[in-house]
Amino acid sequence: MPRVKRGVTARARHKKVLALAKGFRGRRGNVFRIAKQAVMKAGQYAYRDRRTKKRVFRQLWIARINAASRELGLTYSQFANGIRKAGIEIDRKMLADIAVHDKAAFAGIVEQVKAKLAA
């Protein structure tokens, strides 16, 4: 059986890791040993933060809805309760967008919610 030399595969593997580490600061971007660790850590952060992103955006939407509804005299919890009672099925993402970009439409939604809460 002939001897297998690993130079080509090792070079390819190193190139792949260094390509993933492109743009990293200092030796993390150009020394294989350090770049390999940095790429693995970056992958862990990416995996974790893809899940965290969903929570962070939901928090942002709720904060925006809360701020807009407080300007119109309701807390977020009152608004959320009223919107459920009013049967308005708009998700938080859309409500936050409406609250930021179309204040008149959001005010209309809040009026409907207030009417349902008063009834």
Swiss-Prot record:
InterPro entries: Ribosomal_bL20 (IPR005813), RIBOSOMAL_L20_CS (IPR049946), Ribosomal_protein_bL20_C (IPR035566). Transmembrane segments: none annotated. The keyword RNA-binding applies. Disulfide bonds: none annotated. GO terms for biological process: ribosomal large subunit assembly; translation. GO terms for molecular function: rRNA binding; structural constituent of ribosome. Keywords: Ribonucleoprotein, Ribosomal protein, RNA-binding, rRNA-binding. Belongs to the bacterial ribosomal protein bL20 family. Binds directly to 23S ribosomal RNA and is necessary for the in vitro assembly process of the 50S ribosomal subunit. It is not involved in the protein synthesizing functions of that subunit. HAMAP family: Ribosomal_bL20. This is Large ribosomal subunit protein bL20. The lineage of its organism: Bacteria, Pseudomonadati, Pseudomonadota, Betaproteobacteria, Burkholderiales. The gene is rplT.
